[in-house]
Regions:
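Donor nucleotide-sugar binding/catalytic pocket of nucleotide-sugar-dependent glycosyltransferases
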Residues: 119-171
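N-terminal pre-catalytic "stem/leader" segment of glycosyltransferase-like enzymes
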Residues: 1-74, 227, 401, 433
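Short hydrophobic beta-strand element within catalytic cores of glycosyltransferases
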Residues: 310-313, 329-330
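Conserved catalytic-core segment of nucleotide-activated headgroup transferases in glycan assembly
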Residues: 20-22, 26-27, 35, 165-275
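A charged, aromatic-enriched C-terminal amphipathic alpha-helix characteristic of glycosyltransferases
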Residues: 357-361, 371-402
């Protein structure tokens, strides 16, 4: 019998964690080394529509979904894909897989969660470094004296999130729905993809507010200028969320000391991976841009880069693993303390730091990129090649298989038993008396 592997993950959700979970689980199924059962869990309010019945690999996942409440047998290996404070260690060998951290320090609850497992897998060197460098003092509750340290005590391995280059690639194909959306965009544009999360002006995690502000200030009163397209949402894809995004954009526009400002568009709603690739490749999109304050990995930036168009993003956190500074535009800035309005208890902690882009320098680079687009074309193509050769889904699967063989415990393998051939024997003939 194959070893029993139990996986807990948001595998059905339309989320970054859902995408990551589906890729990892598909890889494990293809290895054919384990008897796999999967417990599907929610991821916030994201839709539970991540499994596509037209994709054979998703049907293989669906066949292994486990709907029972408990386990009758202890798993040989348990994998929990999620945030560390929720990790469960029900197996004989337990693996925690997390996208990691967007700031300079994780919570003590996360460190305790990491230490419940036998092994941790993260997608970037940034996440590994933060987990290994986060240390808390242990204090006696009675005397308040320091009695030790709380730090990660288990091995952490880096396995990048591979891009499916069969889907995310340079293409001239068109999607009817994407074409209809983009028909409203006037002229050339820069594209941002990501959530618009909580936080005051310039303080939300992806710094969408800062991006909109800088873009408007940079191109106000300019005769020739691009538009900015935001593929974004907040908590979900509801009408209320749509109105809130529109309101935020209008508020920022109201802070600009001119009525002559660039167009800001936003796309709100759930697009398939193929539709996202069509959006990245749309002829009006000239560059991909983000002012993100921190990424555990930054998967959308990797997928966008496969279009062959230049990517502009901060030079800090997870995405610098795959964005080569020779082929991308990495923005300068500095580490700043997380603002109270952006604190998310247990995830983005008060007192931790993340990256704030230097807006003045960014404005200069944005304008230079727009004016000198041709000069950056070859860099965009080289970045796409860099990802397809080094950060593809197939490459990730290869590295994951080697990691499983090397790091997972050796378990008994099923073998066919073949008995040796025995010489034929003749029984003695019995004679009647």
């Amino acid at each position: 019998m194959k070893p029993f592997m139990f996986i807990m993950a948001p595998v059905e959700t339309r989320s970054g964690y859902g995408d990551h979970a589906r890729d990892l689980i598909t890889s494990l199924i293809e290895m054919d080394m384990f008897d796999i059962k999967i417990k599907s869990v929610k991821w916030g309010n994201t839709p539970m529509t991540g499994l596509d019945k037209d994709r054979p690999e998703h049907l293989e996942i669906e066949k292994r979904l486990y709907w029972e409440q408990g386990l009758n047998v202890q798993p040989d290996v348990m994998i929990h894909i999620g945030v560390p404070n929720e990790f469960q260690n029900w197996g004989k060998f337990n693996v925690g897989i997390t996208a990691g951290i967007e700031t300079t320090q994780c919570s003590s609850d996360w460190i305790q969660g990491l230490n419940k497992m036998d092994m941790i897998i993260v997608p970037s060197q940034h996440s590994k470094d933060v987990f290994e460098k986060t240390i808390f003092e242990k204090k006696d509750e009675q005397t308040n004296q320091t009695i030790g340290e709380l730090k990660c005590e288990v091995p952490i391995h880096v396995l990048f999130e591979g891009v499916n280059i069969d889907i995310f690639k340079k293409t001239n194909e068109k999607d009817e729905e994407v074409e209809e959306m983009m028909s409203q965009v006037k002229g050339e544009c820069f594209l941002f993809v990501g959530h618009w999360l909580k936080g005051e002006m310039g303080q939300d995690r992806k710094d969408v507010s800062g991006l909109v502000k800088v873009f408007c200030e940079t191109f106000k009163n300019q005769k020739r200028r691009p538009s900015l397209v935001l593929k974004t949402s907040g908590a979900d894809f509801s009408h209320i969320d749509r109105r809130e995004i529109r309101s935020k954009i209008q508020q920022i526009k109201g802070t600009i000391d001119s009525q002559d400002i660039p167009n800001i568009y936003f796309i709100h709603g759930d697009l398939s991976e193929k539709q996202m690739n069509h959006l990245y490749n749309h002829s009006k999109v000239k560059a991909h841009i983000s002012f993100t304050k921190g990424e555990g990995y930054g998967r959308p930036l990797a997928e966008a880069a496969c279009s062959g168009k230049i990517v502009m993003a901060p030079k800090w956190s997870g995405h610098i693993d795959f964005l080569d500074p020779k082929f991308s535009i990495l923005l300068n800035g500095q580490l700043t303390e997380v603002h109270d309005s952006a604190v998310w208890e247990g995830v983005i902690n008060k007192g931790s730091h993340w990256f704030t882009t230097d807006y003045a320098l960014a404005a200069t680079m944005i304008k230079n990129l727009f004016v000198n687009q041709k000069a950056y074309k070859s860099r965009g193509h080289k970045q796409a090649k860099h990802i397809s050769e080094n950060f593809s889904l197939d490459k990730m699967k290869e590295e994951f298989k080697e990691m499983v063989k090397k790091e997972f415990p050796k378990t008994a393998k099923q073998i066919d038993i073949k008995l040796p051939d025995l010489p034929s024997m003749e029984l003695p003939t019995l004679r009647s008396s």
